[in-house]
Amino acid sequence: MSIKPLPAILFATATALALTACGSASTPSAPTASAKASSAAAADPSTAPLRGIVIASTEYNSDNTTDTITAYDPTTGEVTATRTFTVPSEYTTYTGGACEREHCYSPDFERVLAIDTSGGNERVAVASSDGSFTLLNDLIPVPQGSRSYSNAYAKFGPDGSIYVAHEDKPDDGDFVGTLYRFASETEAPEAVPTTFTVSNTQDFQILPDSTPIAIGYYAWAANNSGIGCYGALAVTSDGTCLTVDKDAVYSKKGKPLSQTTESDKSLRIEEWTKVNLPNLEGTHEIVKTLRLSPDGTRMALLAPFKKLEDDMSFQLYSAPVGGGEATQLTKATDIAGSKHIILAWSE
């Protein structure tokens, strides 16, 4: 076996590397069209995925109502994605009546329910991020000899279906209530059986398994194990319910829905424990909206200053679920409008 001297080996290696480098430099690879399109799409907030801390705000104008959904980076507070919905002025979103809080929005946040309560028979419509606006009333069947009386409540279900509580008034009889499910806003609905009487005075909620239940003023919230509380805004994996009341966050141990009583359906804040957030107490108004981080250790809060002259915008904070110093996401400076809700904190 012959052994080459070290200088010869180094010279050969250097020559090979130089040739390789020249060959590589002579044929540079240009970005493909798909790569450019992907990069442009990622930079466009109107089409980027709604991930991070997702907040909806509603602005009522003289000629329309505008809903804006904005996703913020949970580390920096920078805007990563947006969606805008504009509906006629006679319609409202996030009404607190026919449609309440997060149930006004589809699970993917690409659609929002809009309700017109100006007439005797409420009109229910769906506004989409693609600009479409679809009225659902015309798809609801009205029995012969009856008239459509009320579409009192409307909600999105966990699978994106739309549920509408509808009442008919026969010419010679009492009101008849039916809960309708729309698989989409372009398909005729199907009637859904319920264990409660559907009426324009009975609110309802759709559980994660798509079961409808009657509710009063407070909705049921639970974790993935089914442990929760009425009136909770979020529930941790260990079954701790969290809510906001009187400018403070409160916690309480939850229970399965099957073990709740009528008294549990009311929010008795004296039965809850205040969560200590020292740098917000006394100076900030904590808005009644809250979402947990994907790992369940922190909560996202909206907390504007109590004195409007201090700051007209809403500050976005995250804080440990058990209490402690709240951290402001200082770059989230454009949160404005008259109604706000944190829809999600997702990865």
PLM regions and their residue ranges:
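An edge-strand/N-cap motif at the start of beta-rich repeat modules
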Residues: T32-A81
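Short loop/turn segments that connect beta-strands within beta-propeller blades
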Residues: P74-G77, A127-G131, F182-E187, T236, ...
